[in-house]
């Protein structure tokens, strides 16, 4: 049974009437452009065929009832008439409540909803299960009540909910690609203007995601440290963000910066340039150049931004040794564990899967999880 059938069946069973709509919003993988989003830079993600699905119906009162199918059918119920506050014990509820609370501040022309939520975006892998949930919930209200909100506004609403209500600092990329993703394309997103350009993916190329299953621990504290270091760098150049600093300007004065801050800045500036070039390489179908850019990106994350771990570096090395110059591989996501992403010809997928299965666990003591994904459509009815 797929997620649509599962949530519709559960909806009818629990609420006693049929859902009127089913909405999906995908997870994402970032092909290149890491830790550039909060520096007003560029990112190149694609939506993947793992998503959050919500079967839903409007109510004729001001109550929101939510069932989380993946959490033993836990229930959350709250009123649109009272101030929406955080839930004491159910963390998933706060993503839903936060989205609804922030929607009220944007456009209050909606009533209650019944919904059943289920998803298959792997959690804790850095594939944006939370952004997928936020965008799905926003799209539910937008579709059921015909709210005049576009994908970018639904994405911003989700980001606000996560930053201010859930209390987790995140850039805009994850929500934006979930809302705006395009089938068979990646999206070059300008995180300052929120402009997005669809970039066609070469035919016969697989998007492979391998979860290291190394448990991320440092991610929150280290993420905030990196943000502060980047802000320090921008202040040094008297610019609003590192987006506004050129590599030439940086190289001229790099020795005057704190050495650690200098490394962080160099990563962001070089990664921005790589990301813009990667979009044109992909569009031309130049997988070889894309592979070089992904390798440079990984080295920069490892050596300058210092966010990789030995397990991730091992995975990258195994994949690289198998594919040579036919495609690319790098860590993707915030760092300190999580996943690597590889762009490889479809006919090389079995060899890569076999090499990783034979070597990764033997070297690290951890078993990986292997996903082959398709660049998919952003949020909407399904």
UniProtKB/Swiss-Prot annotation:
The keyword Kinase applies. The lineage of its organism: Bacteria, Pseudomonadati, Pseudomonadota, Gammaproteobacteria, Enterobacterales. Pfam families: GalKase_gal_bdg, GHMP_kinases_C, GHMP_kinases_N. This is Galactokinase. Transmembrane segments: none annotated. GO terms for cellular component: cytosol. It is an enzyme of class 2 (transferase). GO terms for molecular function: ATP binding; galactokinase activity; magnesium ion binding. Its EC number is 2.7.1.6. Belongs to the GHMP kinase family. GalK subfamily. The active site is at 174 (proton acceptor).
């Amino acid at each position: 049974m797929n997620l649509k059938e599962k949530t519709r069946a559960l909806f009818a069973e629990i609420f006693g009437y049929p859902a009127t709509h089913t909405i999906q919003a995908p997870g994402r993988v970032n092909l290149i452009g890491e830790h550039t989003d909060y520096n007003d830079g560029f990112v190149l993600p694609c939506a993947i065929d793992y998503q959050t699905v919500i079967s839903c119906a409007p109510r004729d009162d001001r109550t929101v009832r939510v069932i989380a199918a993946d959490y033993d059918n836990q229930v959350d119920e709250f009123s649109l008439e009272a101030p929406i506050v955080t839930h004491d014990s159910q963390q998933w509820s706060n993503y839903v409540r936060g989205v609804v609370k922030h929607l009220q501040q944007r456009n209050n022309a909606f009533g209650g909803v019944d919904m059943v939520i289920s998803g298959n975006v792997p959690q804790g892998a850095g594939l944006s299960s939370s952004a997928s949930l936020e965008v799905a919930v926003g799209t539910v209200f937008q579709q059921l009540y015909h709210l005049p909100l576009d994908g970018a506004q639904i994405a911003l609403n989700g980001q606000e909910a996560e930053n201010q209500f859930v209390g987790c600092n995140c850039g805009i990329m994850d929500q934006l690609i979930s809302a705006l993703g395009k089938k068979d394309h990646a999206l070059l997103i300008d995180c300052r203007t929120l402009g997005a350009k669809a970039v066609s993916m070469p035919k016969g190329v697989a998007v492979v995601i391998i979860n290291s299953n190394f448990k991320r621990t440092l991610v929150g504290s280290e993420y905030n440290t990196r943000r502060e270091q980047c802000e320090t760098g921008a202040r040094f150049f008297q610019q609003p963000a590192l987006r506004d600093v050129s590599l030439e300007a940086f190289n001229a004065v790099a020795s005057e910066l704190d050495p650690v801050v200098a490394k962080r800045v160099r990563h962001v500036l070089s990664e921005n340039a790589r990301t813009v070039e990667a979009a044109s390489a992909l569009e031309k179908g130049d997988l070889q150049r894309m592979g070089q850019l992904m390798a440079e990106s990984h080295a920069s994350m490892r050596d300058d931004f210092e966010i990789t771990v030995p397990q991730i570096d091992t995975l990258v090395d195994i994949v690289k040794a198998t594919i040579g110059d036919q495609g690319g591989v790098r860590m993707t996501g915030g760092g300190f564990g999580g996943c690597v992403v590889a762009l490889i010809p479809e006919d090389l997928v079995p060899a890569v899967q076999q090499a990783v299965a034979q070597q990764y666990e033997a070297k690290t003591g951890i078993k990986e999880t292997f996903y082959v994904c398709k660049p998919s459509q952003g949020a909407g009815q399904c």
